[in-house]
């Protein structure tokens, strides 16, 4: 899959989760932060990244950089996705179902952030496994990566699109 050049896209960033971690040293605790970020153009391109630093703004900046490096193309069918899909990452499991126009994005926290920035307007989702933000984000990205348009499936099977849909 060709890499997506994020610099050519009008992207929007969203903070999904900021975590403070402590390293215990002889003189006390050393705090650092990790920021889970999602970047998207609202038109089928989305990416997620994790940034770690001693300060929150720096962690966010690094997270955005990482997210832009890991962007994927999401095949959209109008305002929804082409078919139902389950994405898994670690113990995180996310079910994505296409929905009729006007339904809206029915999703919780981390999954909602990704879908909105990807440009999906109508979708039903359900978190089936761990609710850890990092695993949910990565599971959603895996699910979106595995989506295929009817044209792609027809080409892979060597059949006309009408035969698949009809």
UniProtKB/Swiss-Prot annotation:
User: Record's SUPFAM superfamilies?
Assistant: dsRNA-binding domain-like, Ribosomal protein S5 domain 2-like
| Keywords from the UniProt entry | Ribonucleoprotein, Ribosomal protein, RNA-binding, rRNA-binding
Give the stretches traversing the membrane. Answer: none
The chain's coiled-coil residues are none
All copies of the S5 DRBM domain together span 11-74
Per the record, the GO terms for biological process are:
translation
Q: Name the InterPro entries for this protein.
A: Ribosomal_Su5_D2-typ_SF, Ribosomal_uS5, Ribosomal_uS5_bac-type, Ribosomal_uS5_C, Ribosomal_uS5_N, Ribosomal_uS5_N_CS, Ribsml_uS5_D2-typ_fold_subgr
Instruction: Tell me where on the tree of life, at the top rank, the source sits.
Output: Bacteria
Q: Which GO terms describe its cellular component?
A: small ribosomal subunit
Q: Name one GO molecular function term.
A: structural constituent of ribosome
Function comment: With S4 and S12 plays an important role in translational accuracy. Located at the back of the 30S subunit body where it stabilizes the conformation of the head with respect to the body.
User: Know anything about its domains from the record?
Assistant: The N-terminal domain interacts with the head of the 30S subunit; the C-terminal domain interacts with the body and contacts protein S4. The interaction surface between S4 and S5 is involved in control of translational fidelity.
Quaternary organization: Part of the 30S ribosomal subunit. Contacts proteins S4 and S8.
The UniProt entry's sequence similarity note says: Belongs to the universal ribosomal protein uS5 family.
Spell out the HAMAP family in the cross-references: Ribosomal_uS5_B
- What name goes with this protein? Small ribosomal subunit protein uS5
Native organism: Pelotomaculum thermopropionicum (strain DSM 13744 / JCM 10971 / SI)
């Amino acid at each position: 899959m060709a890499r997506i050049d994020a610099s050519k896209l009008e992207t929007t960033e969203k903070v999904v989760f900021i975590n403070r971690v402590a390293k215990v040293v002889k003189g006390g605790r050393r705090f650092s932060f990790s920021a889970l970020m999602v970047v998207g153009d609202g038109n089928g391109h989305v990416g997620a990244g994790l940034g770690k630093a001693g300060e929150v703004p720096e962690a966010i900046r690094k997270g955005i950089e990482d997210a832009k490096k890991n962007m994927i193309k999401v095949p959209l069918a109008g305002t929804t996705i082409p078919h139902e899909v389950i994405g898994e990452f670690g113990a995180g499991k996310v079910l994505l179902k296409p929905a009729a126009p006007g339904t809206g994005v029915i999703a919780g926290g981390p999954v909602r952030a990704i879908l909105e920035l990807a440009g999906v307007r109508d979708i039903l989702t359900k978190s089936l496994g761990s609710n850890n933000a990092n695993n949910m984000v990565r599971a959603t990205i895996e699910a979106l990566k595995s989506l295929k348009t009817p044209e792609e499936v027809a080409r892979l099977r060597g059949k006309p699109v009408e035969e698949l849909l009809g």
